[in-house]
Amino acid sequence: MSRYTGPSWKQSRRLGLSLTGTGKELARRNYVPGQHGPNNRSKLSEYGLQLAEKQKLRFSYGLGEKQFRNLFVQATKAKEGTLGFNFMVLLERRLDNVVYRLGLATTRRQARQFVNHGHILVDGKRVDIPSYRVTPGQVISVREKSMKVPAILEAVEATLGRPAFVSFDAEKLEGSLTRLPERDEINPEINEALVVEFYNKML
């Protein structure tokens, strides 16, 4: 399954989760898109609930199904911690996500574009792979030639707060993942146990 590239507002309403990070799409219409959206509240089966939760998490990070599933498989190999949380930590350590968490982009989709276009450095070296796994302490910065890109500057200015597990220097346009996040610091709206149940049946 390819990565979803359609309208984020419609997808947000379908999932009941803001993919833009603003919440505006749900504040305006908090029901699924379509002619019967306001009345489409049928009860989901156990499988339907698991699938819906998996889709919410996958779309929030903007990944294709194959890439998302492969990351879950990697999480199963961890020797410590719970599977669901380990999976979410791997998602958080993606370079595009860290760029987003630092406030260098307004959405994860935009962060992925910045990485793909070579605007981002890791420890002073250009990395254009969005899935690159960031290690706590590595310095994430903007390439010198990209420091005046309007979209990056606008994102930094628009960011009101950052998670406690990252640090950021707005003047230098650089920051780092200072530590791995705690469970209550990421995606409180997600029930990762349902995602684990879904893949345990599929794998």
Swiss-Prot record:
GO molecular function: rRNA binding; structural constituent of ribosome
Species classification: Bacteria, Bacillati, Bacillota, Bacilli, Lactobacillales
Pfam families per the UniProt record, alphabetical: Ribosomal_S4, S4
Name of the protein in question: Small ribosomal subunit protein uS4
SUPFAM superfamilies referenced in this protein's UniProt entry, alphabetically: Alpha-L RNA-binding motif (SSF55174)
Name of the gene this protein is made from: rpsD
GO biological process, one term: translation
Role: One of the primary rRNA binding proteins, it binds directly to 16S rRNA where it nucleates assembly of the body of the 30S subunit. With S5 and S12 plays an important role in translational accuracy.
Family: Belongs to the universal ribosomal protein uS4 family.
Subunit structure: Part of the 30S ribosomal subunit. Contacts protein S5. The interaction surface between S4 and S5 is involved in control of translational fidelity.
Classification via InterPro entries: Ribosomal_uS4, Ribosomal_uS4_bac-type, Ribosomal_uS4_CS, Ribosomal_uS4_N, S4_RNA-bd, S4_RNA-bd_sf
Annotated S4 RNA-binding domain residues: 93-156
Signal peptide region: none
Gene3D superfamilies: Ribosomal Protein S4 Delta 41, Chain A, domain 1, RNA-binding S4 domain
